[in-house]
Amino acid sequence: EKTRDKVLYGNVDQECTGIVTSCWASVDVIKYVIEKGANLIISHEALFWNHGDHQEWLEESKNSVYLEKRKLLDDHQIVVWRDHDYIHSGIPYKGDYIDGIFLGLAKKMGWEDKLIVNPINEFDPSLLCSTAYSFDHSIKAKDLAKELIDTCHLNGIKLIGNSNADIKKAAVLFHVFGDANEAIKNTDKSDVDCLLSMELIDFTYAEYLRDSGMLGRNRVALGMGHFNLEEPGMEYMLE
């Protein structure tokens, strides 16, 4: 498949009564849509918990959660459209193109004028980078964590590494599912003080950061989680 952007569920020929955007079309999001009288969910991620949103295996196993979630969609004639690649691939911004998801994060945090090139993760060179930030003044790791919690309305953040680090530069750390060799090498060579992490495996990158902190390195990861980092981008999509 060339794109992940497609209708995941429902009848698109019906009249649209309202639109809700979300990072993921969870059961609670579906219930919210029903309550508001809407019938179109624009979701950033897949609907049924797998890459490609395949449903055959769930049908064959008669998965009870799948069947109940599907019934909720059917009973209220809800359509789910996935918008993943488009908003990541570049939207017009100040005469250039920028990743819309992470522009949303920068806007929410007031970091639009602080964007720099991300030295940890390779990024599409055709896009204006929107995944790393340089601050005018240093900020303590704990204070930055609190700012993220308050602004993004989070229940908490996992802090890994030197909790007393002074943050001048921060960067989004993309998916670390297991092998973190490249991310560790790039981090060690960089002057980034804080990593805003999506998925983070304890036995590789997280342990590297813990050891860094124990050796007094000025570096920390703030584990926000995948959806918490990308949700501001789906909020920005409404604009």
Where do the model's predicted regions map?
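Active-site catalytic microenvironments in core metabolic enzymes, especially phosphate/sugar-handling
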Residues: 1-239
